[in-house]
């Protein structure tokens, strides 16, 4: 007699894949923290490059940081020299005068040493993350690689996110009877609190933290795509429920779609930003026809054919 639900226990290979993805996630978080620390250190020395270059850790940013740590004065001659050596790009966010002005800070020996340490740590983290990316790619089997390719078609999901999602939920969706069961397991279903027939708002249930956080990040990226289903969904929910709830709702929808894609082995097709408008139009037509029937009015088949659903 089955009184308890079955629990999925991944095999050793999949557990190792999860550990690789989980460790990569922690290193990515550490990398972001170190980059923020570097930015704060520069601002403390009255050097603000965030409005001058798009990526402080890019090629141009690294060349400018080398110059800052050296203690030399950055002037017109230094700018032209770096430009001639192709160490900085001609197409920076700020013009030449603004860049020279932003580089005129006052950096102490201690600050210079700390910047060197932070930059070394950033390089080490980037190297470790790159190594883990290769290990994860080599660890995936053919079925998991196909699943990653299917999931990547969804807006907001990158290679890294797709690999992490597959490492957690696997490729066999038969162990989740419905998409709602998967969302509940992932901690993306709202709490169900009802009293006296009135349903109250509740927090989302507990679930897999790594899966939930990954999907929330994907949702933030997905809603930025113009004229998309997720973008329109976010706008509609955020207008009356708030941004945070809207992001969780989008993450919930993404996980539902992932279940459908893996269950049916289908490619993703965006429903478009006009999906909700068409759906509302159809519902209004159906409601109107029912009201007419209640009044004893029945439309002829040729009249119904003229109604566009």
Q: Predicted segments — roles?
A:
Residues 1-309:
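A detector of single, family-specific signature residues
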């Amino acid at each position: 007699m089955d009184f308890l639900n079955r629990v999925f226990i991944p095999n050793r290979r999949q557990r190792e894949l999860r550990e690789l993805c989980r460790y990569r996630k922690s290193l990515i978080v550490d990398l972001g923290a170190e980059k923020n620390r570097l930015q704060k250190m520069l601002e403390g020395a009255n050097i603000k490059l965030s409005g001058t270059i798009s990526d402080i850790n890019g090629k141009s940013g690294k060349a400018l940081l080398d110059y800052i740590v050296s203690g030399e004065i950055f002037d017109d001659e230094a700018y032209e020299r770096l430009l001639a050596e192709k160490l900085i790009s001609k197409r920076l966010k700020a013009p030449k005068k603004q860049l020279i002005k932003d580089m005129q800070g006052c950096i102490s020996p201690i600050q210079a040493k700390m910047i060197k340490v932070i930059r070394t740590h950033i390089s080490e983290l980037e190297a470790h993350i790159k190594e883990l990316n290769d290990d994860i790619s080599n660890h995936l089997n053919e079925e998991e690689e196909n699943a990653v390719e299917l999931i990547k078609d969804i807006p907001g999901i990158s290679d890294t996110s797709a690999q992490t999602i597959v490492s957690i939920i696997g490729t066999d969706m038969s162990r989740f009877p419905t998409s709602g069961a998967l969302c509940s397991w992932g901690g993306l279903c709202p709490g169900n609190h009802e009293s006296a027939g009135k349903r109250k708002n509740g927090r989302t249930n507990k679930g897999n933290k790594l899966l939930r956080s990954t999907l929330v990040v994907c949702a933030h990226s997905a809603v930025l795509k113009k004229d998309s289903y997720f973008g329109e969904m976010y706008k509609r929910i955020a207008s009356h429920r708030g941004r945070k709830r809207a992001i969780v709702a989008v993450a919930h929808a993404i996980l539902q779609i992932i279940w459908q894609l893996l269950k049916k082995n289908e490619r993703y097709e965006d429903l478009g930003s006009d999906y909700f408008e068409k759906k509302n139009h159809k519902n209004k037509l159906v409601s109107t026809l029912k009201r007419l029937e209640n009044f004893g009015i029945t439309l002829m088949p040729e009249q119904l054919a003229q109604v566009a659903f």
